[in-house]
């Protein structure tokens, strides 16, 4: 189905209840209005952070899909040249001396770095491969690049994006795909690929984590928007590593949306005062927290487990160091 026809159909199913506005992260800070977008005003999508909360309250249509299309159109976005050159939506990181994952050729599964990790945090690939190895899962690197979730791809219809995913994933040959980004897992599953975020296998191996040397930190958890309903599972994982978890409201990191993200992050930071670090399950959240001036130090989930294993090799790449690292 043509993308414009698809979006028009989704808009026509909106009943105008306004619940999407009530839960919208951006709207609270003077940003987008999803109801106006659903009623045809694409310009009202300005300020959308892509949190997807609109989808969680709507039983009639798919407002997030419409919002992403609207953001794509009002910003005249096309698939970037860097994607055609590298397979990724963002330029590859220039960090040096990053520890190398110990991939196994023709392994039982593959690990997908995703665009954010490839661009700004390649050390998370090392941390995640090492944790999977700890759990008895050997991996080979997924070389298919981007999952086509990002907004620049939202001018394409589902058929076109699925075709890209199926073509770029041929190297899987039916094997399991683990992702570092939760959005990648959802996108790849939508194309019929056996994919899951790495936390899914971690949560099934808590006894392995409890047997590690451990790490004594007081932390908050921000799972990221896609995994917001899984905070209890994250808590069990973090506690199994030896940490104390301070409960805090789950929320979007705000990404890098001008005029919105600064306000969103200020609230996130204020809600977590006093912790040693915030543990996240999303690379986009990781990048946002790590870049926030004078903010709370951040650990990606597999980095925390890596620390519990006694390996701190990813810490030197952080902008904000975790000041209290004791085992």
Locations of the language-model features?
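Cysteine-cluster motifs in flexible loop/terminal segments that predominantly coordinate metals
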Residues: 14-20, 48-54, 256
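Cofactor-cradling patches in redox/metallo enzymes
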Residues: 116-122, 126-200, 229-327
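Selected transmembrane alpha-helices and immediately adjacent juxtamembrane segments
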Residues: 111, 219, 225-229
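Iron-sulfur-cluster electron-transfer modules
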Residues: 4, 8-11, 27-193, 202-207, ...
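Conserved AdoMet/S-adenosylmethionine-binding subsite of the radical SAM
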Residues: 211-221, 233-240
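The feature marks the first
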Residues: 22-25
């Amino acid at each position: 189905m043509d993308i414009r026809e698809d979006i028009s159909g989704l808009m026509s199913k909106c009943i105008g209840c306004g619940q999407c506005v009530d839960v919208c992260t951006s709207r609270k800070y003077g940003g987008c209005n999803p109801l106006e977008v659903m009623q045809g005003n694409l310009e009202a999508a300005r300020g959308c952070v892509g949190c997807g909360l609109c989808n969680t309250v709507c039983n009639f249509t798919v407002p997030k899909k419409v919002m992403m299309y609207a953001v794509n159109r009002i910003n005249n976005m096309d698939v970037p040249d860097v994607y055609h050159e590298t397979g990724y939506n963002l330029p590859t990181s220039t960090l040096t001396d990053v520890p190398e994952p110990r991939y196994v050729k023709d392994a039982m599964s593959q690990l997908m770095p995703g665009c954010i990790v490839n661009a700004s945090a390649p050390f998370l690939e090392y941390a995640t491969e090492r944790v999977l190895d700890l759990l008895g899962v050997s991996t080979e690197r997924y070389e298919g690049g981007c999952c086509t979730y990002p907004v620049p791809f939202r001018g394409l219809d589902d058929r076109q994006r699925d075709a890209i995913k199926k073509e770029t994933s041929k190297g899987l040959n039916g094997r399991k795909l683990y992702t570092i980004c939760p959005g990648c897992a959802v996108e790849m599953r939508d194309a019929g690929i056996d994919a899951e975020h790495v936390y899914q296998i971690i949560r099934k191996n808590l006894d392995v984590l409890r047997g590690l040397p451990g790490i004594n930190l007081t932390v908050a958890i921000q799972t990221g928007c896609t995994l917001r309903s899984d905070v209890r599972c994250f808590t069990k994982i973090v506690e199994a590593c030896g940490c104390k978890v301070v409960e805090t409201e789950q929320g979007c990191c705000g990404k890098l949306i001008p005029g919105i993200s600064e306000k969103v992050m200020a609230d996130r930071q204020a809600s977590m005062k006093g912790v040693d670090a915030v543990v996240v399950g999303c690379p986009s959240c990781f990048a946002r927290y790590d870049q926030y001036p004078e903010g709370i130090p951040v650990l990606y989930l597999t980095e925390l487990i890596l620390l519990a294993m006694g390996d701190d090799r990813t810490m030197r790449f952080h902008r904000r160091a975790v000041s209290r690292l004791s085992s």
